[in-house]
Amino acid sequence: MQGDGKNRLTVDIFGQQYRLSGKASVNHIRMVAGFVDDKMNEISNGNHRLDTAKIAVLSAVNIADEYFRLRQEYEELLKIIQEEAKAKPID
């Protein structure tokens, strides 16, 4: 960690090296980079004709779709929990 409170590290995503920095732990940054790398490789393996830019955009769209689905599921579960908490009598 540097004096500015950020962790810095170099990661490999789809064969390219990137220098990343952030306040998250080094392990978290590596996990995120690995997730992006895995997604790009998954898309690339499905269609070998796509260039890197298209693979990156399709990966971003897939990741955003997954994020929005999970966020919607989270909000639905939170609503259920809140409704159950309201219905539960206070002792």
Tell me what each language-model feature is.
Residues 15-62:
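Amphipathic, hydrophobic secondary-structure cores in small proteins
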Residues 1-31, 75-91:
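Extended beta-strand/beta-hairpin segments
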Residues 49, 53-91:
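Long, leucine- and charge-enriched amphipathic alpha-helices
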